[in-house]
């Protein structure tokens, strides 16, 4: 019997014998009872048997495991690694993107969930929100449509969010992940109808995470959210954070961390037409002192990219990118992997950062590096064209989706990640 591992997939295992200790490489993850085990090491207790799962990444190439025996001996276990279908993958992301943004007479082929601008009682937004809510509900999440009217006109809802909750082990804390589902409203010089990059891409990422997280167990109560009104000033996430309702952000629990997905897919490893890689932005916060690391989630951000995914952290281009981080831009302007602590705002992570949560913000290329967002050219076809084909886009989005997912899983089991106000 030959045992192998497939990239990006789950693999069941069973260890027998008290004191047996299994150690795995940094890019293979152990889960017991649905929870990631930090450090990649487990020991069989007095019960004499331990069942769990291993998860590889799409980029795992070797599986060199070591089993340490109670008598001091050890056994090397080298398993072949085969190409698999990752639990979160670019191909499924693209299929869902294509369905949501396509318009045709066959509803099985085209969802037509476009024109999702917020603030005018838009029936297209209502229809899309109901579709997204149904996705989370169908997976078994406690899901709510959150409406807030704060100007007295019910035909112009201030915000309409989709909030999916997953109960954690610890009732005293809360954490979350989200993306805004609204698109820039139409105007004479701006506006979009697909909003493929900004932010159908992040919305679909959240849909895939919800499926991947169904059978996992987290430390804290966890919200997976699709925000409205980001384009009108973060009103959706602010409504969730500041209002009192059964499914709003609880005020009596410690808000530990939040990860935000906005404008996804146009980033390294995809390349521009001139051959340069697109910049890759991922910023942690709060960043109180640009000369010091302020928060523990920065260690998770760096570890995932540098050690687990083995990203080219020192890769540079000749010249300079069009835009990037707030801090350190003078020394980072030509850096492909713009991954560090920073004060950068402009999206829904600011809502939670202002409440003391440690945050990570994933953002693709923007402004001079890719300026199609907030315009009629923000389409899936344009994204494909800009990166040189569908396969390249799928590779690009798959990398950042795995980075954010691993950050979330590891942060969940990192006790040092606390609200900075504690």
Task: Give each language-model segment a name.
Residues 3, 13-19:
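Aromatic/hydrophobic beta-strand junction motif of beta-rich domains
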Residues 48-59:
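Short, hydrophobic beta-strand segments
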Residues 164, 177, 182-234, 403:
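Alpha-helical metal-binding/catalytic segments enriched in His/Glu/Asp
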Residues 363-422:
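His/Asp/Glu-rich mid-to-C-terminal helical/loop segments that flank catalytic regions of hydrolases
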Residues 102-167:
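A non-catalytic alpha/beta surface segment that caps or lines the substrate-entry region
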Residues 68, 72-125, 166, 420:
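N-terminal hydrophobic or amphipathic helices/low-complexity stretches enriched
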Residues 227-359:
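Metal-dependent peptidase/peptidase-like ectodomains
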């Amino acid at each position: 019997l030959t045992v192998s591992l497939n990239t990006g997939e789950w693999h069941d295992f069973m260890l027998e014998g008290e004191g047996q200790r299994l150690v795995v490489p940094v890019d293979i993850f152990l889960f017991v009872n649905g929870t990631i085990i930090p450090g990649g090491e487990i020991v069989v207790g007095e019960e004499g048997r331990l069942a769990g799962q291993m998860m590889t990444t799409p980029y795992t190439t070797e599986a060199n495991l070591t089993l340490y025996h109670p008598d001091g001996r050890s056994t090397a276990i080298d398993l072949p690694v085969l190409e698999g279908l990752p639990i979160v993958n670019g191909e499924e992301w693209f299929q869902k993107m294509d369905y949501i943004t396509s318009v045709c007479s066959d509803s099985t082929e085209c969802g037509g969930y476009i024109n999702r601008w917020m603030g005018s009682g838009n029936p297209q937004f209502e229809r899309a929100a109901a579709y997204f809510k149904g996705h989370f509900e169908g997976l078994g999440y406690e899901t709510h449509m959150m409406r807030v009217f704060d100007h007295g006109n019910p035909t112009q809802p201030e915000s309409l969010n989709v909030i999916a909750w997953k109960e954690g082990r610890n009732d005293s804390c809360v954490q979350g992940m989200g993306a805004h589902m609204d698109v820039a409203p139409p105007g004479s010089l701006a506006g979009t109808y697909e909003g493929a990059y900004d932010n159908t891409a992040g919305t679909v990422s959240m849909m895939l995470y919800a499926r991947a997280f169904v059978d996992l167990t987290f430390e804290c109560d966890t919200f997976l959210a699709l925000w409205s009104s980001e384009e009108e000033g973060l009103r959706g996430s602010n409504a969730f954070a500041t209002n009192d309702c059964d499914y709003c952000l609880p005020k009596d629990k410690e808000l530990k961390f939040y990860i935000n997905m906005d404008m996804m897919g146009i980033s390294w490893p995809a390349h521009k037409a001139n051959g340069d890689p697109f910049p890759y932005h991922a910023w942690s916060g709060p960043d109180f002192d640009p000369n010091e690391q302020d928060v523990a989630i920065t260690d998770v951000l760096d570890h995932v990219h540098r050690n687990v995914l083995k990203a080219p952290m020192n890769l540079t281009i000749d010249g300079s990118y069009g835009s990037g981080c707030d801090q350190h831009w003078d020394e980072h302007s030509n850096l492909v992997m713009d991954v560090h602590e920073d004060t950068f705002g402009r999206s829904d992570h600011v809502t939670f950062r202002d409440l003391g949560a440690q945050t990570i913000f994933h953002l693709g290329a923007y402004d001079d590096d890719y300026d199609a967002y907030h315009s009629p050219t923000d389409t899936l076809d344009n994204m494909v064209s800009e990166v040189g084909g569908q396969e390249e886009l799928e590779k690009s989005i798959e990398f950042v989706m795995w980075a954010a997912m691993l950050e979330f899983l590891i942060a969940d089991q990192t006790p040092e990640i606390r609200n900075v106000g504690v």
